[in-house]
Structures are given as C-alpha cells and as structure tokens.
Amino acid sequence: MPERSDLTWLFFKTSGRVSRAAYFLGGLLVAIIQAFPLYRFTLVPEGSAESNMWSFIFFIAFIASLWSNIALAVKRLHDLDKPGITALILFVPIVSIVAFLVLCLFPGQPGPNRYGQRTNEPAQP
C-alpha cells in the first residue's frame, strides 16, 4: 500500500508528473468517493436529518474531488510537458471530454522534462 505522503502528493499537490494509468485510476477513485455519498443520499427519506447529513457529506466530497481532479490533470499535463494552467480547459463543457480523452490516451514524454525527472513522482527542487 502506498504511503500516506504518496497519496497526499497524488491527490492534492501539483508538482511532478503522473502517467496515463495513474491519472485514470486516480480519477476513477475520486469519482467513486464522490459517488458514494450521492448514492447514500438517494436511499434516505427526502427532508430527513440523514438526508441533510448525506447532502453535506456530498458537498464536502465534491469540493475535495474538484481539487483532486485539478491536481491530477496538472500533473498529467506536466507529463506531456505542458503547463498546468492548461487544466482550466477541463471546465469548458464539451471541450473537457476531448481534453480528458487526450490526457488518458496520449503518452507522456519519455525521460526527464522541465516538470520532473520521472513519471509518477513529485518534482525534485
């Protein structure tokens, strides 16, 4: 199992590079974490205290997943030797689908680039 600092880097830091597989699997995990409270919300009676609790948990999960998706995309763009600011394109409807496919399908730069020596590790200062 990865160390806690590795998971913190993967989901919350923007330095370094990630591979296509790490980007896709990290994004899938974020989506599952985000979907769970939404699923639980649909199972409880509308307007109940439990409903309010699950909607609040979903809101927190959504905010955390938003940042996690940005951090993953920035590191994936770094692997393609592109600036992280380009990740903002993921907020444009329709274009975001194409951008997601590009990030999942295009191979990263082999060897070192200006964002890190190797894929799937933080950049060294």
Locate predicted features:
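Membrane-interface extramembranous regions at the lipid-water interface
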Residues: M1-L29, N69-I85, V102-P125
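Membrane-helix interface segments in multi-pass membrane proteins
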Residues: A31-L66, A71, G84-L90, S96, ...
